[in-house]
Design a protein with these regions (language model features):
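Hydrophobic membrane-insertion alpha-helices, especially the h-region
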Residues: 7-26
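Positively charged n-region of N-terminal signal peptides that target proteins for export
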Residues: 1-5
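Short linear S-[DN]-x-LW-Φ motif typified by the pepsin-like aspartic protease active-site region
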Residues: 31-102, 109, 119-177, 182, ...
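Short, surface-exposed interaction patches in beta-rich subdomains
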Residues: 176-181, 186, 190-354
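Glycine- and small hydrophobic-rich membrane-insertion segments that are intrinsically disordered
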Residues: 27-35, 109-119, 288, 293-305
């Protein structure tokens, strides 16, 4: 019995080695290329002459919306038979384009089919969808949700004008124009863009605004906001996260600084600061007993305030007890920036070159 078992093991081992050798021969004689071709995901290209609304229904793909090279709208993506990425379903009705995920069916036909699709992904992107909008055309509305809420660039909008948005994703805008709407962002960045009549909730994440204009915009619940060469029009309100040590860095273009009303304030809240640092107490004496050495705590508290530098040094900061305020009044101007915060560092200065 043992002899038969030994023979069976030897035969199995030899067969395995032979299989690996044959697979290697196939690999080095072009078999792997053929495997890629057979198992490649299906590329989908759709063209439309007229669209006014785009709805993207909670897909796991990154979305890239950009300017088209011709007068048509184009949608490009790839579906995989083996559903390593949930396949997409596309529908269009009366100018409304809808993208949604199909139910996964897992049609894997053996390890070689799976391997082939993995290899094919080197040249066919199954993780993103591209939507192209003709130059000079304006989308009436863009609605969308992404599974990759905190990922940089899960929604990229470039060289496109949109009248209204309703988005929940990580957002990157490049030379984009948004006229109205609401955005819930795990990450938000706008470069050379214009935002109007828009509310942004940053979910305690980062907001970056570079050479961008805000007009009647509210941005709330961010952890860090960096704005360089910012243009302010109309009434704009920034409200950082209340329960952490937030940072707001602002640098306005000269024209905006000369024509703006500023109302900036931050309040030191010891209890909230202590909770952010992991301490819970009822009295200040209890906090001192819990912390022991208060030097680190005091160092963090010193970061709370309004700080000016460069062209902003002439602006006066009023300090009273645990509150600091900076007010600049231009009665003839309709432009204003209001920042109301707790336990925040607010810097008005020209960014240091990297």
């Amino acid at each position: 019995m043992k002899k038969k078992l030994t023979i069976a093991i030897i035969i199995g081992f030899v067969s395995l080695i032979a299989g690996l050798i044959l697979a290697g021969i196939g690999f080095f004689t072009g078999g792997i290329t053929r495997l890629e071709e057979v198992a490649a995901p299906t590329e989908v290209h759709k063209t439309f002459t007229d669209l006014n609304t785009i709805k993207i229904d909670f897909i796991s793909h990154s979305v890239y919306i950009k300017e088209s090279s011709d007068s048509n709208y184009h949608v490009t993506y790839a579906n995989s038979d083996n559903n390593m990425q949930s396949p997409l379903k596309l529908a269009e009705k009366e100018g409304t384009l809808t993208l949604s995920s199909q139910q996964e069916s897992f049609a894997i036909e053996g390890i070689m089919q799976y391997l082939g699709e993995r290899l094919a992904q080197r040249r066919i992107n199954v993780f993103s969808v591209t939507i192209e909008v003709p130059k000079g055309k304006t989308l009436d509305k863009l609605e969308g949700e992404s599974l990759h809420f905190y990922e940089y660039g899960s929604f990229v909008i470039e060289n496109v004008h949109i009248k209204e948005v309703d988005l929940s994703a990580g957002i990157f805008l490049d030379n984009a124009q948004i006229d109205s709407g609401k955005i819930t962002a795990g990450y938000f960045e706008a470069v050379n863009s214009a935002l109007r009549n828009t509310s942004i909730s940053a979910n305690k994440s980062s907001v970056n605004l570079i050479e961008t204009s805000l007009e009647n915009v509210t941005i709330k619940n961010y952890q860090e906001l960096n704005a360089d060469q910012l243009t302010i029009l109309g009434k704009n309100v920034l409200t950082p996260s209340e329960y952490s040590l937030s940072v707001t860095n602002i640098n306005l273009i000269d024209k905006s600084l000369q024509d703006i009303n500023l109302n900036i304030s931050t309040q030191l809240d010891i209890k909230t600061l202590a909770e952010h640092l992991g301490y819970h107490y009822k009295t200040l004496e209890e906090l001192k007993q819990a912390v022991g050495d208060m030097s680190y705590f005091n160092e963090q508290a010193e970061n709370v305030g309004i700080f000016t530098k460069d062209k902003y040094q002439t602006l006066s900061i009023k300090k009273e007890e645990d509150k600091q305020t900076l007010t600049l009044e231009k009665r003839e101007s309709n432009n204003s920036l209001t920042i109301t915060s707790t336990n925040a560092t607010i810097n008005l200065r020209t960014p240091t070159p990297k």
